[in-house]
Amino acid sequence: MSACKSFAPIADEQSRILILGSMPGIKSLEQQEYYAHPQNRFWRLLALLLQEDVPQDYAAKQALLHKHQLALWDTLGYCEREGSLDSSIKNEAPNAVVELAGELPHLQAVVCNGGKAAAAIKKYFAKRMPEQVQIFYLPSTSPANARLRLEDLAERWQVILQFLA
């Protein structure tokens, strides 16, 4: 088992939506970038939904988030895990998600990217979220969720567009 620690959130006071994963995978931890695995569809999905070009470097990815008032973090701050699969997570500790939500004055929605993020939200945070924040449980963009095509993910994830200016 390897000890894994999440990154700092990408957020600013204009953020309207907080997208939460579970814990960065091995490739992301190695590169110190959210959703760094080339087969993860997160960045391609956002680009499709937002009608933008797929960002090619991490600075452009962060700029895309800020431009569209999106924040990004993980539900877990620490865990032990062999490999990258959420099903291997043990000894988890949550991030301060409710506290971050309270620091984002325009936050309207929290989006869980996948089942483990959804389970962590329900376990640790859902009852303590600010009243105006809606929570959405959406399918994972992970390559492990190969049963859904990018177009299928976009159909489910388009719910976020209602919160964007």
State what each model feature region is.
Residues 16-22:
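Short, hydrophobic/glycine-enriched beta-strand segments
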Residues 26-29, 80-83, 118-121, 143-147:
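Short catalytic/ligand-binding loop motif for oxyanion handling, primarily in non-cytosolic enzymes
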Residues 27-88:
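Short, surface-exposed acidic-centric catalytic microdomains
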Residues 67-117:
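Internal catalytic-core helix/loop-beta-alpha segment
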Residues 1-16, 37-38, 85-98, 122-165:
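C-terminal capping/extension of enzyme domains
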